[in-house]
Amino acid sequence: MRLHELSPAPGSRKDRKRVGRGDAGRGNYSGRGMKGQKARSGGATRPGFEGGQLPIYLRLPRKRGFFNPFRIKYAVVNIEQLNMFEAGTEVTPETLLAAGLIRNFVKPVKILSSGHIDRALEVSAHKFSQAAKAQIEAAGGKVQEIDYAAEIE
């Protein structure tokens, strides 16, 4: 085998489309049909254009309201998940992380009231829903809110 005998694998290289080079094949109108907007240079319509009909993105109702970019996103733990701890245990964000109920300390922890709790626990978290606080105290436990702003500084 010599250098001049090397050639690419069959079908690996495709000839480019040469348009407007004579009457055979793609000559004359170059695959653009006859006249009209799409036959002209730069003649494509913008995305979402429906031929002058009121487009779908204007026909549908808009989202309303305000999105607060500075809102605090919480790592949520439901009180039914706290039943995995022994009665009398002090539950903190550190113990929740060790138990795999939260992923990391990036977000503050909020305890919500889904499910029910059947043991007395001392729960420390950054935020509690009113119903969760009431259920923990009704089960004989204690609730302590941690100041999240103090942790950031």
Curated annotation (Swiss-Prot):
GO terms for biological process: translation. SUPFAM superfamilies: Ribosomal proteins L15p and L18e (SSF52080). One of its GO terms (cellular component) is cytosolic large ribosomal subunit. Keywords: Ribonucleoprotein, Ribosomal protein, RNA-binding, rRNA-binding. Residues 1-47 are annotated as: Disordered. PROSITE patterns: RIBOSOMAL_L15. Pfam families: Ribosomal_L27A. Part of the 50S ribosomal subunit. Belongs to the universal ribosomal protein uL15 family. Binds to the 23S rRNA. This is Large ribosomal subunit protein uL15.
